[in-house]
């Protein structure tokens, strides 16, 4: 039978509940326990798929095509375990399910109420994750802050859950903040005390307090917090601000979080294998030469809008012994100031996904600059579509070429709506979503990077390359290096003769992991490193490779 851990947060929002949940998952997995993590979000949207990135950050897509909270990306990256649509629950989806049941008559004419129907549906979703995943431990993060009206049904549901499984099979973690007041020179515990008081009023006594702070927490303070909040001193876990989110599991392990959880849940403490993770953090803190990467996007004012892209770049830099020097470039600024002024000196350019025509001309200009200046380029989803438009206009002779999404009346719709999307009216959950296979063409950069004939990648799009222009693109120099197995959909393109120029219709960033970077991102960083001034050892290695290549070339004499 599964064990259950519930993670709540208090005092302020964005306290780091998701990282705590993901870190605990990492620590449990390092001891041989299987883990699944789900997020309960208190907003009324059915899912975040139609929400603005400025409101919510990126939308993370699961293998089965769910559009979910970005925290699921943290869960997958930390535990290296694929989540599903069951791992993302919103108030909107709960109410939708309950109302549908009421309309079908499932409640036999009874009055439908928050208790027991809404809370019962929430509990059922948690049980469903346990049954579907078969995990030893199911960790549930409750979104929002204790005291919010929106979170009350979720908190009541996890209180009731204790009756479902018994007290020895679940644990409550409360993440809170200890603010430092400069005038008094002290970390203050009163906000934490009041947050726990709110939680107790609901009927939940936390087993562990994870206390965020920007400076060390001494034993006297831990005793004070434990005494006022009713937890053992050892269960007051300091969580100091870290230089990287990947350092948090190590910090929490040193403070005893996992041992305390194992004790509460009556689980055996197996030997922990965190060696690779410790090495990863060491490399993060001791990086190699910086690689300058420009991320050209529409939503660059909010870094979380491209969270998985940034993490994928970090993973690639880690493996390549490089440090990431990221420049956030607003696509609209390129339209105003030109690409040369904003991209000069960059070692690589990434154009990620997005929607709408704002900033598209800037993205196209950035892609043209990368192509002509021979700067390594990677396009993702809309980034591939912009690369197609750029080539059509400037190399294939298709004046005015565009996407049917951006310019419905364009004379050359090189990007058009997928046939199966023609009659779709609703926006939410109706795109081409989730994992689809892609067949890699032989003798291509893609084949070199992947080393596979067929790969499986996550998608989120309605528009696709228009095959009416396929032959023209090939004849003008484009290489279609990846397609759907039936050859109908173009998934991956590249340019031969360029140091690194490739773009894909899918989202490879969702599959990148610490220590296991996605091949496309690793290839980009590897190509970018070739632009860096070579160290003496590296220069010697490159010269050696050049000499070997020259010896292998057939003679042209005679």
Swiss-Prot record:
GO terms for molecular function: ATP binding; CTP synthase activity; glutaminase activity; identical protein binding; metal ion binding. Residues 542-552 have a biased composition (Polar residues). It comes from the Bacteria. The active site is at residues 381, 507, 509. SUPFAM superfamilies: Class I glutamine amidotransferase-like, P-loop containing nucleoside triphosphate hydrolases. Residues 1-267 are annotated as: Amidoligase domain. Pfam families: CTP_synth_N (PF06418), GATase (PF00117). Keywords: ATP-binding, Glutamine amidotransferase, Ligase, Magnesium, Metal-binding, Nucleotide-binding, Pyrimidine biosynthesis. GO terms for cellular component: cytosol. It catalyses: UTP + L-glutamine + ATP + H2O = CTP + L-glutamate + ADP + phosphate + 2 H(+); L-glutamine + H2O = L-glutamate + NH4(+); UTP + NH4(+) + ATP = CTP + ADP + phosphate + 2 H(+). L-glutamine binds at residues 354, 382-385, 405, 462. CTP binds at residues 13, 148-150, 188-193, 224. Residues 292-534 form the Glutamine amidotransferase type-1 domain. Allosterically activated by GTP, when glutamine is the substrate; GTP has no effect on the reaction when ammonia is the substrate. The allosteric effector GTP functions by stabilizing the protein conformation that binds the tetrahedral intermediate(s) formed during glutamine hydrolysis. Inhibited by the product CTP, via allosteric rather than competitive inhibition. The keyword Nucleotide-binding applies. GO terms for biological process: 'de novo' CTP biosynthetic process; pyrimidine nucleobase biosynthetic process. Residues 536-558 are annotated as: Disordered. Pathway: Pyrimidine metabolism; CTP biosynthesis via de novo pathway; CTP from UDP: step 2/2. CTPSs have evolved a hybrid strategy for distinguishing between UTP and CTP. The overlapping regions of the product feedback inhibitory and substrate sites recognize a common feature in both compounds, the triphosphate moiety. To differentiate isosteric substrate and product pyrimidine rings, an additional pocket far from the expected kinase/ligase catalytic site, specifically recognizes the cytosine and ribose portions of the product inhibitor. Catalyzes the ATP-dependent amination of UTP to CTP with either L-glutamine or ammonia as the source of nitrogen. Regulates intracellular CTP levels through interactions with the four ribonucleotide triphosphates. Homotetramer. NCBIfam families: PRK05380.1, PyrG. Belongs to the CTP synthase family. This is CTP synthase. It comes from Prochlorococcus marinus (strain MIT 9303). The gene is pyrG.
